Amino acid sequence: MAVVINKGIFIVAAKRTPFGKMGGALKDVHPSDLLAVAAKEAFKAGNVAPSLIDTSNIGQVYTLSGTSDGGLSPRHAALKAGIPQEKPALGINRLCGSGFQ
């Protein structure tokens, strides 16, 4: 008999963005686009549809990076990854430990 759990908090997969250097190959990639790629890959690895996500927790350093997103990069990334608009997104800045939280 299969057990289905429909309440609780689940981490089904995680992915990270690549490291880069200032002015390097990623300098023209918008932060929310890069975050959206990582989110889509996590959905794929966890075999989860974006529509099933209730809340996005996105770890990111330098959230106010001078881009048009400003501090909204996690929210914009969630939307670009296909998470429904009515679902919240939380940006976490713990410097090097951002992704671990």
Where are each of the predicted segments found?
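Short intrinsically disordered, low-complexity coil segments enriched in acidic
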Residues: M1, N57-V61
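Condensing-enzyme catalytic core mediating Claisen C-C bond formation in acyl metabolism
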Residues: A2-S32, E41
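Active-site loop-to-helix "anion-binding N-cap" substructures in soluble metabolic enzymes
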Residues: A25, V29-P31, S51, L79, ...
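Short, well-ordered amphipathic alpha-helical segments that serve as non-catalytic structural scaffolds
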Residues: S32-N47, S73-A77
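Short acidic capping loops at alpha-helix termini that bridge into adjacent secondary structure
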Residues: A49-N57, Q85-P88
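Conserved catalytic cysteine-centered active-site region
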Residues: Y62-Q101
